Amino acid sequence: MATTMEQEICAHSMTFEECPKCSALQYRNGFYLLKYDEEWYPEELLTDGEDDVFDPDLDIEVVFETQGNSTSSDKNNSSSEGNEGVIINNFYSNQYQNSIDLSANATGSDPPKTYGQFSNLLSGAVNAFSNMLPLLADQNTEEMENLSDRVSQDTAGNTVTNTQSTVGRLVGYGTVHDGEHPASCADTASEKILAVERYYTFKVNDWTSTQKPFEYIRIPLPHVLSGEDGGVFGAALRRHYLVKTGWRVQVQCNASQFHAGSLLVFMAPEYPTLDVFAMDNKWSKDNLPNGTRTQANRKGPFAMDHQNFWQWTLYPHQFLNLRTNTTVDLEVPYVNIAPTSSWTQHASWTLVIAVVAPLTYSTGASTSLDITASIQPVRPVFNGLRHEVLSRQSPIPVTIREHAGTWYSTLPDSTVPIYGKTPVAPANYMVGEYKDFLEIAQIPTFIGNKVPNAVPYIEASNTAVKTQPLAVYQVTLSCSCLANTFLAALSRNFAQYRGSLVYTFVFTGTAMMKGKFLIAYTPPGAGKPTSRDQAMQATYAIWDLGLNSSYSFTVPFISPTHFRMVGTDLVNITNADGWVTVWQLTPLTYPPGCPTSAKILTMVSAGKDFSLKMPISPAPWSPQGVENAEKGVTENTDATADFVAQPVYLPENQTKVAFFYDRSSPIGAFTVKSGSLESGFAPFSNQACPNSVILTPGPQFDPAYDQLRPQRLTEIWGNGNEETSEVFPLKTKQDYSFCLFSPFVYYKCDLEVTLSPHTSGNHGLLVRWCPTGTPNKPTTQVLHEVSSLSEGRTPQVYSAGPGTSNQISFVVPYNSPLSVLPAVWYNGHKRFDNTGYLGIAPNSDFGTLFFAGTKPDIKFTVYLRYKNMRVFCPRPTVFFPWPTSGDKIDMTPRAGVLMLE
């Protein structure tokens, strides 16, 4: 009897149903969309019917259920929005009044190609976050002969890279660069030059045992290829004003099977580098990862070029673990604040190679390993001219506010726009957008061991002590060891959480080492386990070292309450949830010539069912020793719950980006000059309260010089110039909550502005808004007895007398010529001569406000609220000071830090 098509054998010696190529839903540019999980995989991985990649484990998968109300037809001028949970009456019969995204009108009809669901963040052929999946050509070769047999070959132009120990290529943000022309350029582009798209290989540096954890080397792109070593690409780069390109990178480090250690290799957008955009010639490490200082005698909480290396895994990355692989492959698309880049002023991508587990070896082995890098520009497009489109303006309809007389920082609606229907620069070229913080909370970041002298690993040896665990972690988000994980950084902005936690361990010993470990979770109530036998009475797993060097241990959510507190003042049943302990089950075994110990990287992430609720202000940043350490033991807690892990999904969550930032935050206090309602505007300041402000969440106004005019800064400054633990209150003006937690490189939104006077009374207040780049300064008075802020077509708002409300509120549309704005740091200069501040992009704000009034004693607070917020490309948050032994970070009453003794 004839067989069906599913039972027939295809050209790949498999049935059509089992063959990933023949059953693929789609093929495009060397990638297959596989049927079984609807994820994209590169063709080079689908070469052998016995490969594990045909049926890989999906270790990290974001499952989002429908949240809030679904969209419906617009009847009677109303819209239903699930995040805010209310019905908003739309008085203007227009669903988007503040700014109009022109992305659909930009050059090119095809949308950006993404590869999978979670792949739109940090994905690719291999899940590199919690499982280094071997791409075995012959499994027996590795298991029986201890030889790597994971072959990968890539051809670019007349160059070929080949490796026999690959872990696959990671495609950053799940998107490859398409080579489309930028919509901002009208000239004919230079592209598709075969001699340009090739690998350029060079030595990076030597790796020795002297390098400590988190020492790094930075390689800014494209500048490392802009010289003679860049060949034809460098020549084309030097002859063009603008370039738009993706990057493909392979980093190699050949070591023997008797070497141990691990490197973290990642590609980071807008990563701080040297002013000259040159590759580091030696290994470096920031002593305090809270940003660099431009002047040694000025102190403050942190600078805007901060980098928290405990969260570097938020960037597209792979581990070069000498036990598993000797090469890593990364590919990233083009990202920038504009559709193309002025490369002489800006390095949008930086390749960073960092040590996470130091190099170890035995006597007689090679003491130094060479690190080399092969870099290929992917489909570069060169342009020389720029084309800009003028913006249109339209009048604003006026209506009475339905909540007149009252103002709430979280009122779930939009106020009157100061400009309506304002076109904005297209951003359809951008990739790496995420809409829920849980997407990146599921990316493992490093746990600090041996706090306060923290390291990202624990150590195992050839002895197994039953009463001495390798690690003990409290199952609470306020545990001191988690202080610099992204999971804890995100959670500090919320009051309560629910769901499981995932602890990930990566063994970095030599390839010749074997051993077993026991990982246990013990609920509270009976104290933490003091021996391995006690730990085995609870939930545990045995990890056997093999080809897979990593293990993920999920801690189930077991609680007497539906939600648990993120922070803690005193340990109780609503915040602490037991311990995770790691024990050595058997001693490490190895042949002669191997090191006698090995390091295990430790990371944590959110589980699939993890959720947070009730956004709050983040905790103060500076450390204060005010309270003794907590024991971390709770009493009278029922520890007899079922340990079988069950998902605890919620139908909705409050971690969506648009919802989280849709609330007002203050940027500082301001004042007016007496009698300025009837005269020309003049810069003025009273008690560090100026009469103008740039609309941006970043810092401005230099307190050391008592500036009268607003000026963007790259650092946040406090009350004095002395370096003390107490730097508050801040003298610079900024949205401190935004600066403290903005885990993204770029953002785009409209801005709701609210002015709230400190006192009521009979006074007049005039506010003039100048869009970004407005050339005129409102200083010259043209009309007699009329303020210079009132003249012309520039939008203005006037309030006189006490009325029914003291607040002034309006929405400013996104009006920068940039397609997106840098959230924290711009790794470039404004000017062609590369002078001035490094870190502030040109016109990267929402304009400027000028104030005039009748009385000099009027003071008011300016609030910013981010409407229609979109964010792109995850990045680390601010470094959180490790608690010292016997102390904890004072975060009362919002959050606390538990210490282990």
Swiss-Prot record:
Q: Name one GO biological process term.
A: symbiont entry into host cell
Give me the Gene Ontology terms describing cellular component.
host cell cytoplasm; T=pseudo3 icosahedral viral capsid
Q: Which domain of life is it from?
A: Viruses
Write down the Pfam families for this protein, in alphabetical order.
Answer: Rhv, Rhv_5, VP4_2, VP_N-CPKC
Q: List lipidated residues, N-myristoyl glycine.
A: 68
For this protein, the record's SUPFAM superfamilies field holds: Positive stranded ssRNA viruses (SSF88633), Viral leader polypeptide zinc finger (SSF144251)
> Where do the annotations place RNA binding?
22, 46-50, 69-70, 93, 95, 97, 100
InterPro entries, alphabetized:
Capsid_VP4_Picornavir, Capsid_VP4_sf_Picornavirus, Leader_pept_picornaV, Picornavirus_capsid, Rhv-like, Viral_coat, Viral_lead_polypep_zc_finger
| ZnF (unnamed) intervals | 10-22
Residue(s) at site: Cleavage: 137-138, 393-394, 624-625
Which GO terms of the molecular function aspect are on file? structural molecule activity; zinc ion binding
- Which keywords does UniProt give here? Capsid protein, Host cytoplasm, Host-virus interaction, Lipoprotein, Metal-binding, Myristate, T=pseudo3 icosahedral capsid protein, Viral attachment to host cell, Virion, Virus entry into host cell, Zinc, Zinc-finger
Q: Does the keyword DNA repair apply?
A: no
User: What family is reported?
Assistant: Belongs to the picornaviruses polyprotein family.
What is this protein identified as?
A: Genome polyprotein
Per the UniProt record, the source organism is Mengo encephalomyocarditis virus (strain 37A)
Q: What is the lineage of its organism?
A: Viruses, Riboviria, Orthornavirae, Pisuviricota, Pisoniviricetes
